[in-house]
Amino acid sequence: MNRLPSSASALACSAHALNLIEKRTLDHEEMKALNREVIEYFKEHVNPGFLEYRKSVTAGGDYGAVEWQAGGLNTLVDTQGQEFIDCLGGFGIFNVGHRNPVVVSAVQNQLAKQPLHSQELLDPLRAMLAKTLAALTPGKLKYSFFCNSGTESVEAALKLAKAYQSPRGKFTFIATSGAFHGKSLGALSATAKSTFRKPFMPLLPGFRHVPFGNIEAMLTALNECKKTGDDVAAVILEPIQGEGGVILPPPGYLTAVRKLCDEFGALMILDEVQTGMGRTGKMFACEHENVQPDILCLAKALGGGVMPIGATIATEEVFSVLFDNPFLHTTTFGGNPLACAAALATINVLLEQNLPAQAEQKGDMLLDGFRQLAREYPDLVQEARGKGMLMAIEFVDNEIGYNFASEMFRQRVLVAGTLNNAKTIRIEPPLTLTIEQCELVIKAARKALAAMRVSVEEA
């Protein structure tokens, strides 16, 4: 039976939500009611699959905490008042912490003046952010296109590469096995996870995948494409594969790929949506090898965990294909004043507080602790790896990974798996995590592994 629209129901629901937004605290009955509502509405109106996913990694087999507010820069508080150290970081968006006061203040100040742009007049913050990114990014990167997410940033990069290379007769893209570049149609064509790809086949033609970190395979693919007339427009890579399981390539790999791109006349697109903005101990992961891409993709942490924003930054030579018609690729909300205010404040915080260097220092401390645990629990842990504050613990099988996430939840530390590698639990906290909190995370991981070993022995 078709359901008739109900303005009265929608009005009541929106009014109830606005009342919740105004509240700072909930009493016990309000908390219980909100939990019930959220679970019901996820099941009936969002996607019940999300409930089952959270159930698999949450203490007691429950649906998990209903988040309520940030506890501090590095913690989350649920509706029951439980505080969690955030070692997931919203999949990499909270590099400067939760509700960083500098970022929040910038957004509030802009909101008091003008929240969105007119689309016709020139908006100053978009210009200032583009100038700032031109100064911040490596090499000859100069012009920025702004959007709202990582997958949009990748879509723009692919279209930009096509527009530049099509007159040169180059239409092929090379990506890598294990890659994750997003789930919109173009980005998904570069993504390498069959689970995400198969339901939407056929994807865009002209994409090939080679093993990540294997420079000989990259050379072979470029040569074969040249022989068959399928000349390569661009190679698209993550400097470190995040959703693939925090996979680091061999030293010198990015440098070698850059040389091959130059040799074959292919553009180099670096997807730093997850590795950028100080995450790996440098402002951008490509700086570890002083590699300069032709196109750089950013998002996630660019908005400081306050506003969604993505950016595609390119050299003048490449970006100039859009000069004659700047409307070839645009978005309504891309580069809006609130998002640009958040991004400018985020960059300011990262530089003023030298957070990339802090990420290197605290990341080394955490990784040393996790590697020690891997030595103590070889029956459970296969490897701990990472760079800066992008780390992973890989377990001997998927089930142990889920159990670890559940045990860490009991210890009030929030972690989760990676999308392309179910055996791997990602550790991706805010770069503002304190030394004391780092120690608590390692202690919680030790307790979690000890409890898991007891469970295995008793089984």
Swiss-Prot record:
Q: What is its EC number?
A: 2.6.1.82, 2.6.1.29
Q: Which residues carry this modification: N6-(pyridoxal phosphate)lysine?
A: 300
Pathway(s) annotated for this protein in UniProt = Amine and polyamine degradation; putrescine degradation; 4-aminobutanal from putrescine (transaminase route): step 1/1
The entry's pyridoxal 5'-phosphate-binding residues are 150-151, 274, 332
Q: Does the keyword Plastid apply?
A: no
Task: Check the record and name the InterPro entries matching this protein.
Answer: Aminotrans_3 (IPR005814), Aminotrans_3_PPA_site (IPR049704), Class-III_PLP-dep_AT (IPR050103), Putrescine_aminotransferase (IPR017747), PyrdxlP-dep_Trfase (IPR015424), PyrdxlP-dep_Trfase_major (IPR015421), PyrdxlP-dep_Trfase_small (IPR015422)
GO biological process, any: putrescine catabolic process
Q: Per the record's keyword annotation, is Transmembrane included, yes or no?
A: no
* Annotated Gene3D superfamilies: Aspartate Aminotransferase, domain 1, Type I PLP-dependent aspartate aminotransferase-like (Major domain)
The cofactor required is:
pyridoxal 5'-phosphate
Q: Which UniProt keywords apply?
A: Aminotransferase, Pyridoxal phosphate, Transferase
Q: What does this protein do?
A: Catalyzes the aminotransferase reaction from putrescine to 2-oxoglutarate, leading to glutamate and 4-aminobutanal, which spontaneously cyclizes to form 1-pyrroline. This is the first step in one of two pathways for putrescine degradation, where putrescine is converted into 4-aminobutanoate (gamma-aminobutyrate or GABA) via 4-aminobutanal. Also functions as a cadaverine transaminase in a a L-lysine degradation pathway to succinate that proceeds via cadaverine, glutarate and L-2-hydroxyglutarate.
Give the protein family.
Belongs to the class-III pyridoxal-phosphate-dependent aminotransferase family. Putrescine aminotransferase subfamily.
Listed name of the protein: Putrescine aminotransferase
Q: What is the gene name?
A: patA
